[in-house]
């Protein structure tokens, strides 16, 4: 299994939570990047406020670490309502969801992270709640059991997932606002790094922020994590200020290279190049070659490598691109 503490892992780590919370923007105007999504949300939120209605149900999907939870909180702040947060695996029984729904006030946001992992029995309860703001509850057991309907206040369900394709069709169809988050460009990440440094009261120049941003794999969570580690290096080895020189040396020490790759990324790419002559190679063979599960490759390692043009998916398997060979200063065979 892949190590849970990879520095450039986009999934949240225990030490991220409290620090990320302090760095999160609170309103849309403070939110950097995702321009199309931000523009859409401004329209939808203003329209709902003008009509004095709850915002339509929203599905936010995309790779981990891009700000799905942050966006859900911003939606609640912009609407001026409360937010209750949970996750799909936590809602094991219908009663778990019913307890949350019955405590919502009019217009509130219910945020369910990893919504693709909801159990079928919980999902069934969610359908009438989303469509009709009604909760169907079974009272009693056996032959004496009967169903009663409870009216719920209008609310907004915000679901977040890294695997939109894993949602059932009936659930996916009930979201009126689907929003896909993309990897961030370096310019926007530099802005995020600079803002986070200000929150941390850390002296950083534009080149230092850029160097951290370009090694952050298009992911704000990784950028903030790298910033904290570069800060440590700057305070111990230098005068505490983060320059390009300091950032380069700190990240080289941390084994995060110029493309934001760590040893696992290099291991995957070199396996395709060396063991399978550049590909194509099937996912199962590749997983066996590097000692990882196929889901880890698909969900954790591959997305960024494909998006950046280092791996190509074909019907016959994965292929290392010319850019992958260039990264390792190798010549791609004809």
From Swiss-Prot:
InterPro entries per UniProt: AAA+_ATPase, AAA_lid_4, DNA_helicase_Holl-junc_RuvB, P-loop_NTPase, RuvB-like_N, RuvB_C, WH-like_DNA-bd_sf, WH_DNA-bd_sf
**For this protein, what is any one GO molecular function term?**
four-way junction DNA binding
Q: Which intervals of the chain are annotated as region Head domain (RuvB-H)? A: 258-334
Positions that bind DNA: 294, 313, 318
Q: Where in the cell is it found?
A: Cytoplasm
Looking up CDD domains in the UniProt record yields: AAA
Q: Where is this region: Large ATPase domain (RuvB-L)?
A: 4-184
| Primary location | cytoplasm
Q: Where does ATP bind?
A: 24, 65, 68-70, 131-133, 174, 184, 221
Binding residues annotated for Mg(2+), in chain numbering: 69
One Gene Ontology term, aspect cellular component: Holliday junction resolvase complex
Q: Which residues form a coiled coil?
A: none
What GO biological process, any one, is recorded here?
Answer: DNA repair
Q: What does this protein do?
A: The RuvA-RuvB-RuvC complex processes Holliday junction (HJ) DNA during genetic recombination and DNA repair, while the RuvA-RuvB complex plays an important role in the rescue of blocked DNA replication forks via replication fork reversal (RFR). RuvA specifically binds to HJ cruciform DNA, conferring on it an open structure. The RuvB hexamer acts as an ATP-dependent pump, pulling dsDNA into and through the RuvAB complex. RuvB forms 2 homohexamers on either side of HJ DNA bound by 1 or 2 RuvA tetramers; 4 subunits per hexamer contact DNA at a time.
- Quaternary form? Homohexamer. Forms an RuvA(8)-RuvB(12)-Holliday junction (HJ) complex. HJ DNA is sandwiched between 2 RuvA tetramers; dsDNA enters through RuvA and exits via RuvB. An RuvB hexamer assembles on each DNA strand where it exits the tetramer. Each RuvB hexamer is contacted by two RuvA subunits (via domain III) on 2 adjacent RuvB subunits; this complex drives branch migration. In the full resolvosome a probable DNA-RuvA(4)-RuvB(12)-RuvC(2) complex forms which resolves the HJ.
Instruction: Give the protein family.
Output: Belongs to the RuvB family.
Recorded protein name is Holliday junction branch migration complex subunit RuvB
- The encoding gene: ruvB
